[in-house]
Each structure stands twice: as structure tokens, then as C-alpha cells.
Amino acid sequence: MIYIFLANGFEEVEALATVDVLRRADLKVKIVGVGSDVITGTHGISTVCDVVDSDLTPGDDIEAVILPGGMPGTLNLERSAKVNAFVDYAYENQKLVCAICAAPSILGHKGMLKGKKAVCFPGFESELEGAELSDSFVVTDGNIITAKGMGSAVKFGIAIGAAFVGEAKMKKIEESLQCS
């Protein structure tokens, strides 16, 4: 299962474009609300989640954990013990850990980016502790995928999807979305 965590103040396009792209690839994605099943994004758009974080426990079904950015959404994700437990489990078990915009800062604070190439929203670079910063819109380094921000959300989803279904299938999806 691919888990994407939403906390109040998340960046709507980063979250929902990513989910859309992954579901077009027939991947199982569960939208997890932090503290509630209805989460409001930074631009006032409310999203009904598939499940509330309190109903979940990290385990073997984790294939990937995705953290969208946005403020204060990123801060709210980082404060969540459940989000941290899922991120830690995924990282320790070599599953995908994916973060976009400000959210790579969470991985930086955990030391997960040391020696890895990574990217984030401009202004958060100092939070990516030990990372080799990139100018790319999306960066994959081992089991970590990071992306710059809202404008790279579709490419972020494409990169995550490629890890599961291959680049050829994701290229077709990208073309169908008029992104290539």
C-alpha cells in the first residue's frame, strides 16, 4: 500500500495530483488524514480521506510513504507521532519515502538525506541536513524521492509510479496528461 499523509495546511495540488497520477497507474493509494478524516489544505480546500491515522499501524503492507508540502501542513506532519512512525518504518525497511516542497525538511531533520541527492522548495535548503542539493524538479536517490513544489507534482507522481510499474507505463500516463 502507498500511504499519503494529509495534515491541515497541506498543499492541495501536491497531494491530489500525486494521488491522481498513481491511481491512473492502478496503484493502491490510501489517503490518510492526520487527526481527522476531513483535512483542510492551505488554500481552504477540504479533502475527505480514506482513513484516519489513528486507525493505522505501520507494518509490512507499506510500499511507500508520501508527504506533501504546504504550510503549516509540513509542520503538522512533522509533529505527528504516527507520521513519524510510518516514515521511520518505510525508511528502515528500504521502502519508498517521498516528500515534496517543504516536506523534504522532515527527512532532513531525521538524517535520512545524508549523502543523498535531494531537492525542496526554495528557502528550505538548509533543512535538508547532509543532502547534496539538486536543481532538478524531482530527484530519486535510492529509496528517497523528493520534489521542488506544486509545479512538479505531476512529475513527482510519475517518478513514484515508475518505481512500481516502470518508466514505460508512466511515460504513457505522462503523455496522456499532456505533460511531455
Go through each PLM region and give its residues.
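Extended, subdomain-level signal for the structured scaffold at the beginning of enzyme domains
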Residues: 1-96, 106-109, 127-135, 146-180
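Beta-strand-turn-beta hairpins that frame and shape the catalytic cleft
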Residues: 139-144
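Short, thiol/selenol-centered motifs that function as redox-active sites or metal-ligating centers
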Residues: 100-101
